[in-house]
Amino acid sequence: MSQLPKIIIVGSGIIGASIALACQDLNADILVLEQGTSGGVASGTSFGWINASFAESSAYYALRLEAIEGFRNLGLRLDLKDSLRWQGTLWWEDAGADFDAQWTKMLSNGYAARLLNKDEVSVLEPNLVGAPERAILTYAEGAALAHETAKSILKHVSSNGGKLIENCMVTGVQSHYGRLHGVKTNVGNFDCDMLVLATGAQAQSGMDGLDWSLPMANKTGMILQTNRLPPFLNHTLMTSDVHFRQNVDGSLTAGEIFGGDFNPGANPNALATQTLERIR
């Protein structure tokens, strides 16, 4: 009987957890190493919008459609009712010719979408003050609490023989004649056949021991997460101002400065307060 390939995944966020599950489904022996606690850090500050609204090529559009279907299947497989919501999206981020171009592109792609007028938007979102004159409803879209989803995936992986070690800092990789065979950590060394660095902006720091660099353009944005609130919002709202939604647990997630143009001199708390005021 042949030995299962040993795969180490560094990072337990939504990317690392998903890779762990996919590799386990292919009969690999899985070890996930996390420097903090299960679910990672970055996934807890993810907007988590599941969509195929914007794609620069037909191949990318097809990939994103597959991702939506994959998330639906994952939700059924792992019963992600506490972290995954298929609420659809109301979009009016652009206006005029840009709005028309987006609608035309969705139609040409055959995307599940409908053009709404102001009254129709108000019916769908009765608590929305100042409804737009028109918006696009993309009703096949959803959103996930990425951190909680990652934890659910890892729980499934662990229940099927995978292992997760928390508070484990990877300090470098081990290789012999150019071939990787393990990782160095603060709690000891671990052998593996393959290694996945699912550590986002920290990926380069885990490559000590390899004569190879990973070009990255890390920029700063802002995602807001509120405490739980009574239900008042039915869809993800991609407005001309703030992007926001209400999660399964009642909390709000709001996105600001997605493009990475965050002013390093800005006061994050003041900016967060201003953003919440704009939502109100």
Regions found by a protein language model. Give the residues of each.
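Dinucleotide-binding Rossmann-like beta1-alpha1 core, especially the glycine-rich loop
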Residues: 47-124, 241-243
